[in-house]
Amino acid sequence: MAFPTAEELTALIAPVVATRHLDVEGLRVTKAGPKSTVAIKLDSDSRPDLDLLEVVSQEIGELFDAAEARGELSFGAGYLLEVSTPGVDMPLTQPRHWRRNRTRLVSLDVDGKKRIARIGALNAEETAVILIERNKKALSVTVLELANSPRAVVEIEFAKPAQDELDLAGRTFDEAVEETDH
């Protein structure tokens, strides 16, 4: 039996991560004999802490061991299991990524130009998100359709965000859209 693929392992761990209300954001298999690695990136709306990641890592390890004992998987000479969160450099590609990063700054690559905006609310259908930008002293609100979203990554912010930006990011999608109409 061959070393399991990322797709096979993702399907196998799906029930375990679902019971913990986690999403698999990535699973990478690196085959290197006894130094093979299975790296799993998990996230959730409530930001998993280290204690939860430790519990889930234990559960996944036991699941892999049991499947290997039954002959359903073969890791060969062994493997290292890494379970972590994706980190801030993960591109925002799904509506849940935008929802989880509400009020944070995001860097967007629009027509080859870098654009920085604060993430506001998603609409009810989770197909569009509010972006808040500061132009000198004034704030502007734009609606970004996620289907046409450029590459976007969360920006690390060292200074405390301006309160007016946070207030606007905290409004509902419809309230923020109304703000642009005035």
Curated annotation (Swiss-Prot):
Keywords: Cytoplasm, Ribosome biogenesis. Its main location: cytoplasm. GO terms for biological process: ribosomal small subunit assembly; translation. Pfam families: DUF150_C, RimP_N. GO terms for cellular component: cytosol. Required for maturation of 30S ribosomal subunits. Belongs to the RimP family. This is Ribosome maturation factor RimP. It comes from Corynebacterium efficiens (strain DSM 44549 / YS-314 / AJ 12310 / JCM 11189 / NBRC 100395).
